[in-house]
Amino acid sequence: MRLPKEGDFITIQSYKHDGSLHRTWRDTMVLKTTENALIGVNDHTLVTENDGRRWVTREPAIVYFHKKYWFNIIAMIRETGVSYYCNLASPYILDPEALKYIDYDLDVKVFADGEKRLLDVDEYEQHKAQMNYPTDIDYILKENVKILVEWINENKGPFSSSYINIWYKRYLELKKR
């Protein structure tokens, strides 16, 4: 399959461990693809929940997916600053239909003031029992929480203000076309 190019629009689908569709984002604009990563942007993007509810994203958000890390990162660009929502999730796959990954419930939220919070621990424990997450997945996810916190603390990749500035500026240029 050919990789999507800069300016292409793709669909993103998140699933649960049991294979059920969790959430879909329509028309994410691709900013960059490499062999292992995809950077995109959602701006007033239609999101459909598994129960059929629909909503539209409120602000531009740079999205980062990687094929080797068990997380993805959403950098929400607001007037008050950039805040982050990080999903602990399987590395993504890309097929002709969509970019797809498994959402493993745990999330890390980083507020514009730098405060960090680990979210949905109870939901993770509940789903781990219900869906029989294997021990190795549990270990990998917990190790990737550590990697993610390290990236946050070191302002690495998407957590760097220059990264956000570069990709947001590129999005604004592409949007004018």
Curated annotation (Swiss-Prot):
Domain of life: Bacteria
E.C. code: 3.6.1.15, 3.6.1.6
GO molecular function: magnesium ion binding; nucleoside diphosphate phosphatase activity; ribonucleoside triphosphate phosphatase activity
Protein name: Nucleoside triphosphate/diphosphate phosphatase
Pfam families referenced in this protein's UniProt entry, alphabetically: DUF402
Binding-site list for Mg(2+) 1: N87, D103, D107
Catalytic activity: a ribonucleoside 5'-triphosphate + H2O = a ribonucleoside 5'-diphosphate + phosphate + H(+); a ribonucleoside 5'-diphosphate + H2O = a ribonucleoside 5'-phosphate + phosphate + H(+)
HAMAP family reported in the protein's UniProt record: Ntdp (MF_01568)
Organism of provenance: Streptococcus agalactiae serotype V (strain ATCC BAA-611 / 2603 V/R)
